Amino acid sequence: MAQKSLANNSINLPYKDLTSEVTRRRVTMITRKEIITQKSDEAKEMLSHLDLEQAPPPHRTYLTVPPAPPPSPAEDPTVS
């Protein structure tokens, strides 16, 4: 079997210091979370504002009962 050289198996990171790489990634993730949280909060606020304008109050929606369907001709006792 052919042996692989150690140079081919090494990982080449642009940062020599592992601590600085970890710190950089943590800062990036925190920044992303803040941006995503801000965007989702803004979206929720916009949706709630639109819902208030378009939808009836929630206490009205569950109280409304649809009208009963008309009787079927097969069940009508007046027709022989």
From Swiss-Prot:
This is Myocilin opposite strand protein. The gene is MYOCOS. Residues 53-80 are annotated as: Disordered.
